Amino acid sequence: MSSQSLYKVSGNIAANALVNNEQYKTMYQESIVNPEGFWREHGKRIDWIKPYTKIKKTSFDDHNLSINWFYDGTLNASANCLDRHLAEHSDRVAIIWEGDNASEQRKITYGELHADVCKFANALRSQGVRRGDIVTIYMPMVPEAAVAMLACARIGAVHSVVFGGFSPDSIASRVIDGKSKVVITSDEGMRGGRAIPLKRNIDDALNHPDVTSVEKVIVLKRTGGKIDWVEGRDVWWHSLLETASEHCQPEEMGAEDPLFLLYTSGSTGNPKGVLHTTGGYMVYASMTHEYVFDYKAGEVYWCTADVGWITGHSYMVYGPLANGATVLIHEGVPNHPSPARLGEMIDRHKVNILYTAPTLIRALMAEGKQHFDQFDGSTLRIMGSVGEPINPEAWRWYHEVIGHEHCPIVDTWWQTETGGILITPLPGATDTKPGSATRPFFGVQPALVDNMGNILEGENEGNLVLLDSWPGQMRTVYGDHERFVLTYFKTFRGMYFTGDGARRDEDGYYWITGRVDDVINVSGHRLGTAEVESALVSHELVAEAAVVGYPHDIKGQGIYAYVTLTRGTEESEELRQELRQWVRKEIGALATPDLIQWASGLPKTRSGKIMRRFLRKIAANEVTNLGDASTLADPAVIETLIETRLNRTE
């Protein structure tokens, strides 16, 4: 194996991990050669009401698409997260909650969570919710968000969680598409010291003329802030629980019955409702959580994602709770009121496993490691990264400052559509390379293809596809199956197209290069924007960078970089030239940025993803029609970038 920046698995970790490298190779080979046998065995990791006898009926043929797993079995997702732990672990803490203000903390045992979920499930039934109904959840990061999801699953309702930062228009489009009968929200949420007007946003969304399906709005009292009230429609959460029973028999659901809808963010046009079903999803979420994070019984696990994203669904609620973990939920942001908050929470709650995003790591990097001088971190064992490719510089900082150079990092690649992690290191099995997602999880068959769909062998770069199904895969786009087929299975026949580009190195490791539309063609040569961004961020004065292509008379496309400098660094023409030479040295002359624009901030969604379509338009000087900016955390960033753009033609 190439030794360049290789972090080897320590003997101690390999000896104590669920799987070592030899076991990984054996299990992976079996999962590909004999998927029926492999998943027949591993499907037993969850509890079934009626055990399955049929494992897999799948086809990626776009004329005969079929995705079915464990399809004659029945189960209940809520029972798998709660009931099955009660006999032995009723007193184990299921959820540790810390509010935006650290003085607010709660601990909820599995027994208590079970009672809360049963009561709220009965409350939902009292408001007319029935099996198959769609319930929209628009909640802050409080335990009741998980309670609402599990209560829906308990009675066979389909939850559609909308991220608590989305605008009324975004909420309305999702409610309309799903024809939601009931909406669950809160008076307000708290984030970074500010109150977020959740109920007001719901009121505005439901005033949309095309919203006609909603009958009830259930409101949790979080802050006690002033809200408007619609008599006959609105009802308090606590009022419903006063008369609700703690006993609620879980509904028997088919493996292929829907569990939830989750609308993908950042897409143009109508929202895309990703539909996940029950059996395969629960098997895959619980299995990936256990193996990827090398989870051991009773450990404290902290996923910093919001419950409104797929990461919150799979790796804050369903996966960890199915495995009986103690889950830390944080209402605010882990760098408020100071960058020390992340370390303080790890120490305060004795966190063993941390799963967070590169955008947070880079934000902490920019503030400086002095904020972690008092950080102990001795309980931390495994660290994960999710959401986008992590640049090597941020990886190393994470490893050194947060992990104290003893915690393996699992850099995970997956999507809303995949339900769970697809490409990832395993802590006891995989030597890691900063920036690489490394190898596929069990049952996952990645491949690289050229633009004609020809499979590329060996060390190569191309479009990332998947050759066969896995249990956590989405089943359809809600209400638009043709869109599902067209988006994922028409581009490359017989394959699932991820929309991402990747390269495979000499060791067979995968490096995600970004969305295919984040590839720049400079003078006939393809350059992944992630590669140029990583080079820029490896400079000590650069906190964050985003790179896009723009029309260039000679090269076809030029390279336009937006650069945020570290705190206290002065912008100058000299530094601009230094960065151009830095990238030239790191990658080569071809990758030298043509234009570098200083950016005090980048346009991001509230989950931290950079909205590159805005950056592409600004770089191309197309600033009159930027499109919908409702999902941006701070729309004012766009105005600043437009005013300071470098590619003006007028």
From Swiss-Prot:
EC code(s) of this entry: 6.2.1.1
Annotated residues for binding of ATP: G387, E388, P389, D411, T412, W413, W414, Q415, T416, D500, R515, R526
Location of N6-acetyllysine modifications: K609
Enzyme class name: ligase
Protein modification: Acetylated. Deacetylation by the SIR2-homolog deacetylase activates the enzyme.
Residue runs in coiled coils: none
Pfam families, A to Z: ACAS_N, AMP-binding, AMP-binding_C
Transmembrane feature ranges: none
Record key words, sorted: Acetylation, ATP-binding, Ligase, Magnesium, Metal-binding, Nucleotide-binding
Positions contributing to CoA binding: R191, G192, G193, R194, T311, N335, S523, R584
GO-annotated biological processes: acetyl-CoA biosynthetic process from acetate
Reactions that this protein is recorded to catalyse: acetate + ATP + CoA = acetyl-CoA + AMP + diphosphate
GO molecular function: acetate-CoA ligase activity; AMP binding; ATP binding; metal ion binding
Sequence positions that bind Mg(2+): V537, H539, V542
A cellular component term, taken from the record's GO annotations: cytosol
Cofactors demanded by this protein: Mg(2+)
Protein task: Catalyzes the conversion of acetate into acetyl-CoA (AcCoA), an essential intermediate at the junction of anabolic and catabolic pathways. AcsA undergoes a two-step reaction. In the first half reaction, AcsA combines acetate with ATP to form acetyl-adenylate (AcAMP) intermediate. In the second half reaction, it can then transfer the acetyl group from AcAMP to the sulfhydryl group of CoA, forming the product AcCoA.
Family indicated by similarity: Belongs to the ATP-dependent AMP-binding enzyme family.
NCBIfam families: Ac_CoA_lig_AcsA, PRK00174.1
Protein name: Acetyl-coenzyme A synthetase
Species assigned in the record: Shewanella sp. (strain W3-18-1)
Gene: acsA
